[in-house]
From Swiss-Prot:
Principal place of residence: membrane
Name of the molecule in the record: Stage II sporulation protein M
Keyword Membrane found: yes
Its job: Required for complete septum migration and engulfment of the forespore compartment during sporulation. Required for stabilizing and recruiting of SpoIIP to the septal membrane.
Gene responsible for this protein: spoIIM
Cytoplasmic side: 1-18, 107-108, 161-180
Assembly and interaction partners: Component of the MPD complex composed of SpoIIM, SpoIIP and SpoIID.
Alphabetical UniProt keywords: Cell membrane, Membrane, Sporulation, Transmembrane, Transmembrane helix
């Protein structure tokens, strides 16, 4: 019998949960749109205050006064691991599924607000700035959040079905939890690489760009 590769397992997983992946992706992009809408709903004074602090930050960045890469990496991996770990735990809790929806939506809002504000205030320069400050880490981080969110929801639904059929969670196969834990490890590895990008790549790109803008 041919051994099933990890690629085949992943493709089968996506096929089996395609509707969930679509739902989670739509929820995330709704958050992105909502984040951009929040930018447009801000008053002029609010935008000016926020842009002032942002300009101060970019000014320090262009002067090479940003925090050390090691500190940024530590803060980034801690934040991402905490957020993803909470999603994972909520998937086991069954009743935490609505909170997973909210967390995915909020992640979209953060991305949408960040990009929307930079573009709104700085035009084309803001677009390129968001490109170098947001894109590198989020190339891996956004898929990690979407996969973790989908797996957490799918696992929670599986436990709910088990609860209604068996009237107990004690009969749930231990393999479920093993696979679910493996998913978390893979996602945390993606988050680790993403944090490396955020700490060591994005600041370099931002420093080069801000030195031309500020």
């Amino acid at each position: 019998m041919r051994k099933i590769s990890y690629k085949d397992m992943f493709l089968r997983h996506v096929k089996d949960h395609l509707s969930l992946y679509i739902f989670v992706s739509v929820l995330f992009f709704m958050g992105v749109i909502f984040g951009a809408i929040i930018v447009n709903s801000m008053t002029i004074s609010q935008k000016e205050d926020l842009y002032y602090y942002l300009s101060q930050f970019f000014g320090q960045l262009s002067d090479g006064k940003q925090a050390s890469s090691a500190d940024m990496f530590g803060q980034s991996i801690f934040h991402n691991a905490k957020y993803l770990g909470l999603m994972w735990i909520l998937g086991i809790s069954v009743i935490g599924m609505p909170i997973i929806f909210i967390m995915i939506f909020l992640k979209g809002i953060v991305v949408g607000f960040t990009v929307g504000f930079l573009v709104n205030q700085m035009g084309v320069s803001g677009f390129f700035l968001s490109f170098v400050s947001v894109l590198p880490q989020n190339v891996l981080l956004i898929p990690a959040y979407l996969i973790m969110g989908t797996c957490a929801i799918a696992f929670s639904l599986k436990l709910i079905r088990q609860l209604f059929v068996k009237r107990s969670l004690h009969d749930a196969p231990i393999q479920w939890f093993g696979r679910y834990a493996f998913v978390l490890l893979v996602i945390l590895f993606l988050a680790l690489i993403s944090s490396l990008f955020e700490a060591y790549l994005s600041p370099v790109l931002m420093e080069k760009l801000t030195s031309r803008l500020f």
